[in-house]
A protein has these predicted regions:
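Surface-exposed, charge/polar-rich loops and edge strands
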Residues: 1-389
C-alpha cells in the first residue's frame, strides 16, 4: 500500500520566464535531457533514436485535441468561457458525432454572470449555436443545422491551450498543439511529449524500432491541480482508453518499452491491470485510481496480454474502450514501461508525482539541472528521456 505523501516534497521554484509560451520553429530542435542511473546528459531531440535502447518498442498516444474552448456573451455582453471536459458518454460513445444537440460536462469561467435559466448563443453565417445550463456542471448545446458536434466545435471552438500559458490561442496553435501523428479525436489537451517528433524522425525510428500508436483521450486531469493536503484523496478524472489486438500483440512481443509521454505510460500500466482483472474474474474492467493496491499483480506482462487477447476473442471484440483513473505515485511498481519520454512538468502536480515514481529522488536532480541549463518548461518546452530506476 502506498502511504500518505507530503505534496510539499514534490515542489520546486518555476519562474514565469522558464515557461515556453510558444514552441520551437522546428519541432525536433528542442533540448533533450537524458537521465540514466542518476547521470544527466544534454542532447538534442533529433538524436533521441540514438539514446533509446536498440531492443525497445516505442508507443505513441495518437489522440487528437479538439476545439473544446468556446466563448459566448450573455445578455449584458459579459464574456462566458466554456471548456468542454467530457466528450464520451458512460458507454464510451464519442459524443463528437451527435447532431443537433449534445449534453456535456464543462468547466465554466464567469459562471456567476450566467443566469441559470438564461440561454446564450452565437452565430456564424446561417448557423446558430445555443447553450443552457443544466446541473452538476453539465450544459446542453443545440444548433440549427444538420452538422456533427465535431463540425460545430471546428466552427465555433478554439484550441484549449493550458491556462498556465496565459495567452489566447493563435491560428498556428491548431497545428503546433497537435502531434503530427494525431488521429483519433477526443482530447482536451495535447500529449505534449509527442510534439517534438517530426515525420522524418518517426520514419527513422520506424526503421530501427517497433513503433505503435495507442489511444488515451486526455481529460481535465492533465492540468487539474492537486488541492488536497492528503495526495491520496485527489480526485483523478477518468479518461477513455482504446486498443485493439494488434496493440496487445505488439506489447506482448516487446522486451523493452519506451512510452512517449505520461499518457502513453498511464495507458500501458492500465493495460497490465486489465489483464490482471480478467484473470481475477472482475466484471467491471474500468480502472480505479488505486486499483493496483487491491490486486495481486502476479501476472507477467506477457501473461496479462494473453488474458486480454483471449477475452477479446471469446467476446468477439475487435476494439476495447474502457475508462482509466490510474494514479501513479512514488512507491508504484511499474509493470510495463522501461523508459519515458516527457516534458518538464508543473510543481506539485500529478505528473511530477509520476516522474518521482519512475526515477525516484533523481527527479530533483533532473529539474535542478534543467533550470540551471535554461531548459524550457511545460507543454511547449523541452523534453527528457528517463530510464526507470
Amino acid at each position: 500500500m502506498i502511504s500518505d505523501l507530503n505534496l510539499d516534497n514534490y515542489n520546486y521554484s518555476l519562474e514565469n520566464n522558464r515557461i515556453a509560451k510558444y514552441p520551437k520553429s522546428k519541432r525536433d530542435d528542442s533540448k533533450l535531457l537524458v537521465c540514466k542511473e542518476g547521470k544527466l546528459i544534454n542532447q538534442k531531440f533529433y538524436n533521441i533514436d540514438k539514446n533509446i535502447p536498440s531492443d525497445s518498442s516505442v508507443f505513441f498516444n495518437n489522440s487528437k485535441v479538439i476545439n473544446a474552448r468556446l466563448i459566448f456573451k450573455n445578455r449584458n455582453n459579459t464574456k462566458i468561457e466554456i471548456l468542454v471536459i467530457n466528450l464520451f458518454n458512460k458507454n464510451y460513445k464519442n459524443l463528437l458525432f451527435n447532431k443537433k444537440k449534445v449534453i456535456v460536462e464543462t468547466m465554466i469561467k464567469n459562471i456567476k454572470k450566467w443566469k441559470e435559466n438564461e440561454t446564450i448563443e452565437k452565430a456564424n453565417n446561417d448557423i446558430t449555436l445555443k447553450v443552457k445550463q443544466l446541473n452538476n456542471n453539465k450544459v446542453i448545446f443545440t444548433w440549427n443545422k444538420n452538422k456533427t458536434w465535431l463540425e460545430i466545435l471546428e466552427i465555433f471552438g478554439k484550441i484549449p491551450l493550458p491556462p498556465y500559458l496565459k495567452r489566447d490561442s493563435l491560428p498556428e496553435d491548431l497545428i503546433n498543439y497537435q502531434t503530427i501523428y494525431s488521429k483519433d479525436q477526443g482530447s482536451i489537451a495535447s500529449p505534449t511529449a509527442g510534439l517534438h517528433f517530426t515525420k522524418s524522425l518517426i520514419n527513422k525510428m520506424n526503421k530501427n524500432f517497433l513503433i505503435d500508436f495507442i489511444t488515451l483521450h486526455i481529460g481535465i486531469g492533465t492540468f487539474k491541480p492537486v488541492t488536497t493536503k492528503n495526495i491520496n484523496r485527489h480526485n483523478m478524472h477518468s479518461e477513455v482508453i482504446s486498443f485493439n489486438k494488434k496493440n496487445l500483440i505488439n506489447i506482448y512481443n516487446s522486451n523493452n518499452i519506451t512510452a512517449v509521454g505520461t499518457t502513453s505510460m498511464r495507458f500501458l500500466e492500465s493495460i497490465y491491470l486489465i489483464g490482471q482483472m480478467i484473470n481475477e474474474k472482475y466484471k467491471n474492467l474500468n480502472i480505479e485510481k488505486f486499483l493496483y493496491n487491491k490486486m495481486s499483480n502476479k501476472l507477467t506482462k506477457k501473461e496479462s496480454m494473453e488474458e486480454i487477447i483471449n477475452y477479446m476473442e471469446k467476446n468477439k471484440l475487435n476494439i476495447m474502450n474502457l475508462n482509466t483513473s490510474i494514479f501513479i505515485l512514488p512507491g508504484y511498481n511499474f509493470k510495463m514501461c522501461d523508459q519515458l519520454i516527457t516534458n518538464f512538468h508543473y510543481p506539485k502536480s500529478t505528473l511530477i508525482l509520476l516522474i518521482a515514481a519512475f526515477i525516484g529522488e533523481d527527479w530533483k536532480k533532473l529539474y535542478k539541472f534543467a533550470i540551471k541549463n535554461n531548459y524550457r518548461f511545460l507543454s511547449y518546452g523541452d523534453s527528457s528521456l528517463l530510464f526507470k530506476k
